[in-house]
Amino acid sequence: MKLFFDTCAVIDYLCNRQNADSIEIILIKAEKENWECFISVGSFYTLTYLIELNLKHNGYSDKRERIDKLRQILAKVLSIFYIAEINPIDLYTCINDYSFSDLEDCYQYKAALNAQCNYLITLNIRDFKTADTTNIKIIEPSEFC
């Protein structure tokens, strides 16, 4: 089984927010069952920016120290998630896909399809209400548990 986590789901997990427990249950089960977990390359870029910003605001004022800590955290992220990619043709497809009102969600959806994921796990299921669910099921973390 292959699971794709959108950016907000991963942020909730890393920041121990409202849905962190449900996501952790999924990740533990995924590890136990040898399921593959994916995030998009765009999510990885966003996480890099947000984690560094968070470190800066939480006492890591020294750039070298902050980057070292950032590298540790990102290495942990990469030990949990594979990276699903999209190519320029996919980007053009998303730009011209009027069924999505949020292009970033379309990129996430396309990355999940490219990785042949069975599930796209999101906190904003309404953002994917027009997505074709023939090949992928779109659910919230609590639905999966």
Predicted features along the sequence, with ranges:
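Active-site-proximal, substrate-binding regions of enzyme catalytic domains
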Residues: 20-24, 31, 42-99
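Short, flexible helix/strand-to-coil boundary loops that buttress conserved ligand/catalytic motifs
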Residues: 14-15, 51, 98, 132
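A generic structural signal for short hydrophobic patches within well-formed alpha-helices
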Residues: 10-11, 44, 128, 144
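Short beta-strand segments at enzyme active-site cores
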Residues: 39-44, 122
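Conserved beta-strand segments of alpha/beta enzyme cores
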Residues: 36, 82, 135-137
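Short, well-structured N-terminal submotif of metal-dependent ribonuclease cores
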Residues: 1-39, 54-60, 145
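Acidic, PIN/NYN-like endoribonuclease modules and their adjacent C-terminal/linker elements
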Residues: 2, 29, 110-145
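Active-site neighborhoods of divalent-metal-dependent phosphate/nucleic-acid chemistry enzymes
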Residues: 79-125
